[in-house]
Every structure is written in structure tokens, then in C-alpha cells.
A protein has these predicted regions:
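Solvent-exposed interaction patches of small proteins and small membrane subunits
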Residues: 1-116
């Protein structure tokens, strides 16, 4: 088992994943997301890559109350994706809510990165 990432490392990982998710959201559309299994899997993987560090920051209480409130739901997403419970994952919502979720969750991330 590897070492736990530091707060700064987790913030950087989340920021990098958010940038990749935003880039993918600009390249795809609902039709591609619906018809392309590989694209859909890539988006789910990037969601997991984004949600994991945010969830770790929340669980380990490495961030304040405002960030914990903003990111609390990311742990549910991480748990669903990490345990591959496909029947519980609303893949369409992962795509449809991508811009809104990034807009809501990136603000605390940007503030914390600026303070690091």
C-alpha cells in the first residue's frame, strides 16, 4: 500500500482531473456520449479521477466546512464509480451535469490551490 497523498497533492490531482473533464466536455456531445461506449467509459473514469481526491480531502478533513459542503456529494459519485455498480450509475446525468458540477466544485478548489 502506498503513502497517502498530501493535501497539496490531492488539490493538484483534483485540479488536473477537472481540467481534463472540462476539455472532454468541450469535445463531446450528447449524441457521442450516448452512442460511444469508449467515450462514455472515459468520461466515467475522469469523473472517478476527479471525485477521488475531493472525497479524500473531505473524509480526511483536510479542508474547511465550505469545501466539505461543496464536495460532499463527490464521495457518492466516487463510491458508485469505484465499485462499478453500473445499475446505480446514471451515466446520462454524469454527462448532462458535467458543466454545472464543475462550475460548483471548482470554485473552492481554485481558492484552496491559490492559498497553497
Amino acid at each position: 500500500m502506498g503513502r497517502e497523498l498530501t493535501r497539496s497533492e490531492l488539490l493538484f490531482e483534483a485540479s488536473d482531473a477537472a481540467a481534463r473533464l472540462r476539455k472532454v466536455s468541450l469535445r463531446g456531445d450528447t449524441h457521442r456520449y450516448t452512442d460511444d461506449e469508449v467515450f462514455r467509459s472515459a468520461v466515467a473514469f475522469l469523473w472517478l479521477r476527479y471525485a477521488e481526491p475531493l472525497c479524500q480531502l473531505v473524509i480526511r478533513r483536510l479542508v474547511g466546512d465550505a469545501a466539505r459542503r461543496a464536495w460532499d456529494g463527490m464521495c457518492d459519485i466516487r463510491n458508485m464509480l469505484a465499485h462499478e455498480r453500473n445499475q446505480n450509475i446514471d451515466f446520462a446525468a454524469l454527462w448532462d451535469e458535467l458543466p454545472t458540477t464543475l462550475n460548483l466544485t471548482e470554485a473552492p478548489l481554485d481558492r484552496l490551490l491559490a492559498d497553497s
